[in-house]
């Protein structure tokens, strides 16, 4: 998100600006760096002033005028936008598209392979419960409002969160999901470096379609 500054239209325009991130090593910031470097020849890590911190702190710094822009989780962004002071500069999905990368899963539940083999019924029960929740989130508008109230979200903010997040939930992996993840990794590795990712390549067999 950025303040309503017409001079900031792309991530490349963050050059020389103050920008808030929740972690310099996060995938979000690595994607932002990759787009800025490949599309606008800007190294955000060196050519912008980066402030790390939690989302509420970044919001407060934006309100104080100490930042020109900030990352914002989609559970926070609707409330910031509702103030009328901020607008969306780019979404993570926009950055992926700008890099010419395929849509890929972003967050995962991971299981130890040996445990899965030893407890297939438990694994299946978890996946079934996950499917139930995804179906609920995709179809039940009121569920978002009710859960939002528990999180102190006004109804209009919860509705904004619903609009932002609902389409991001995946119910199953596509047949090309593992290959797509590897392509994203290979594109971002030169930006982040193996020290951030903790490996230089993704091994085969990290996903299974057996429990879909």
What residue ranges belong to the model's regions?
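Conserved C-terminal helix/tail region of periplasmic/extracytoplasmic solute-binding proteins
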Residues: 182-212
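Short secondary-structure capping/turn micro-motifs that flank functional sites
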Residues: 78-79, 96-97, 154, 164, ...
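Helix N-cap/coil-helix junction residues
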Residues: 8, 41-44, 153, 193-199
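Pocket-lining segment of extracytoplasmic ligand-binding domains
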Residues: 56-149
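Bilobed "Venus flytrap"/periplasmic-binding protein-like clamshell domains
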Residues: 1-3, 8-82, 178, 182
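Residues that form or immediately flank small-molecule/cofactor binding pockets and catalytic motifs
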Residues: 6, 24, 55, 93-94, ...
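A diffuse structural propensity rather than consistent per-protein peaks
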Residues: 9-10, 174, 207-208
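Secondary-structure end/capping motifs
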Residues: 116-194
């Amino acid at each position: 998100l950025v303040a309503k500054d017409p001079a900031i239209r792309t991530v490349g325009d963050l050059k020389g600006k103050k920008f808030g991130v929740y972690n310099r090593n996060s995938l979000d910031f690595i994607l932002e760096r990759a787009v800025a470097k490949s599309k606008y020849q800007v190294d955000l890590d060196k050519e912008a002033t980066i402030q790390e911190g939690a989302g509420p702190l970044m919001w407060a710094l934006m309100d104080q005028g100490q930042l020109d822009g900030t990352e914002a989780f989609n559970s926070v962004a609707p409330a910031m936008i509702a103030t009328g002071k901020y607008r969306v500069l780019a979404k993570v999905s926009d950055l992926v598209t700008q890099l010419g990368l395929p849509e890929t899963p972003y967050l995962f539940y991971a299981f130890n392979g040996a445990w899965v083999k030893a407890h297939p019924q438990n694994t299946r029960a978890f996946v079934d419960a996950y499917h139930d929740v995804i179906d609920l989130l995709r179809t039940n508008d009121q569920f978002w409002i009710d859960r939002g109230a528990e999180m102190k979200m006004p109804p209009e903010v919860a509705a904004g969160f619903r609009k932002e997040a609902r389409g991001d939930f995946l119910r199953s992996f596509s047949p090309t999901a593992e290959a797509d993840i590897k392509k994203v990794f290979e594109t971002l590795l030169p930006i982040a470096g193996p020290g951030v990712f903790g490996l230089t390549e993704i091994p085969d067999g990290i996903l299974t379609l057996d429990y879909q």
